[in-house]
UniProtKB/Swiss-Prot annotation:
Its main location: membrane. This is Mas-related G-protein coupled receptor member B8. The chain crosses the membrane at residues 34-54, 63-83, 113-133, 145-165, 179-199, 225-245, 264-284. Belongs to the G-protein coupled receptor 1 family. Mas subfamily.
Amino acid sequence: MDSSIPDPEADLIQLNGSYHTETSPCVIESRVMILLSIIIAFFGLAGNAMVLWLLAFRMRRNVFSVYILNLAGANFLFLCTHTAFSLEKIIVLFHSVHIHIPLLFYTLSTLAYLAGVSMVTAISAEYWLSGIWPYWYQGQRLKHTTTVICTGLWGLALLLSLLEGKSCGFLGSTYNQDVCWKLDFIIVAWLLVLFAVLSRSIQVLLVRIFCGSQRTPVTKLHVTIVLTALVLVICGFPFGIIFYLLYWTTEVYYIMPCNSFHETILLLSYINSCANPIICLLVGSIRHCRFQCGTLRLLLHRAMQDIPEEEGEELEEVVGERVQNSIP
C-alpha cells in the first residue's frame, strides 16, 4: 500500500475523473512540480549534509547545536526517501518505465518527519524555558539532558513509524486497514501536541522580543529558532495532517485544479526540510543589518550564538587574536 504518493501513469493520467494526455496542461504542471521538488531536495540534501559535517566533526557542540545536528539528520533522511519517490515518478512520466521503491522507504519517511518536527519543537520549548527561568535552567539542568531528550524523541518516532509500517503493510506484513487508520490517528494526535507546544513557544519568544518591560536583546540563536519554527508551522505541519489524516478522505486530492494538491504539499515539505541550513547561513551572515561573508563554519557558529551581537563581535575578535598569536 502507498500511504502518501499515488502511482502516476506514463501516457495517461486520470485527473478529476477524466484522462489527460502527456501534452495536457495538467500533466505538464505535474512534471514541473516534480522537477522543482527534486531540485529543491538536492539543494536541501547538500545543505543538511554540510550542517551534519560541520556540527559533527568541525565545531564544538553546545546545548542547542545538538538539536540542530539531530534536525539536520532527520531532514537529510526525509529528503533522501522522498527524492527516491520523486525520481520514480519522473522516470514513469518521461520513460514509461516502472521501478520499484521498497515500501520500507515509507516507514523511514515517517521516522524522519516525526523526528524533525519533534526536534524543532524541543529546541523551541527549551529556549523558551531558558528565557523564563534562566537561573533555574542554568543551575538545575543536567549535563546530558539534550542527549537524553533527542534519544527519547528518536525512539518515540521510531516506535510510531514501526507500528504504522507494520499495520499498513510497509514492512512485509499484512495490511490491516483498521489498525493502520488508528495508528495514523495517533500520529496526528502527537503532531497536534507538538503543534500546540511549538505555537506557545513561538508566541512567548516573540512577546519577549517586542513587548514591554520584558523586552530582551535579540540574539542570532533566537532569530534562528523563531524562523525555523515558523517555517515548520507553515510548510511542515500540513504534510503530516494531510498524509496521516486527510489521506483517508480521497476527496482532499481534488480541491485544487489538476489534482496538484498532492504535489503542492510535498513541495512545501521539501522547503521545510531545506530551510534550516539556509536560515543558519542567512542569520549568520547578517551583522548590523548588512550581509557579511565568511566561511560556512563561521556563519553557522554565528547563527547559534546566544549572546547579543556586540558581545559576539568582541568574542570573535578575542578568538581571532588568540589564533594569530598561536601561529609561529
